[in-house]
């Protein structure tokens, strides 16, 4: 069952925590894309259904166990509804099951873009940004990386249609993002 007759392009953003996924999504939004942040969709559900003391990542794992590995993708497509955007972006894809679910629901104009940044740079960013799910301890950040890899994020990164390396300054990262976006919009 497809939710949209796809004449749009869909970008699935993946990458390890702190790699720059959200920055890429923000740049795409500035270009007029509809952006859905997958973790926000999960957080919305978490606020209603989480068990006392349950971590967000554990809640997401439980959702997958109950509803299948593509559940977060389905929830995100439901959140999308009907869209009149030429470009739709899902920020935070973590498994091939999610990729397959997006393709099943949205058609073949789906492109995976991985944002890559070396671990030392990512850890420094995460310590500086201090999101609620970030830790100040390197050991905790390494543990989180391992959890993400167990979910299958490495497989999604390996299957990426495009990879943006985020190891320089913001202007260079922005240039690389624009280059990849232009390629997706032009050719796919």
Curated annotation (Swiss-Prot):
Recorded hits in InterPro entries, A to Z, give: NTP_hydrolase-rel, P-loop_NTPase
Arranged from A to Z, the UniProt key words for this protein are: ATP-binding, Nucleotide-binding
Q: Which SUPFAM superfamilies match?
A: P-loop containing nucleoside triphosphate hydrolases
Gene3D superfamilies cross-referenced by the UniProt entry? P-loop containing nucleotide triphosphate hydrolases
Q: Which Pfam family name is an example for this entry?
A: AAA_18
An annotated Gene Ontology molecular function: ATP binding
Q: Does the keyword ATP-binding apply?
A: yes
Residues at which ATP binds: 15-22
Which PANTHER family does the UniProt entry name for this protein? DEPHOSPHO-COA KINASE, UPF0200 PROTEIN MJ1399
Q: Which family does it belong to?
A: Belongs to the UPF0200 family.
- Name under which the protein is recorded: UPF0200 protein YG5714_1176
Q: Which organism is it from?
A: Saccharolobus islandicus (strain Y.G.57.14 / Yellowstone #1) (Sulfolobus islandicus)
Q: What is the lineage of its organism?
A: Archaea, Thermoproteota, Thermoprotei, Sulfolobales, Sulfolobaceae
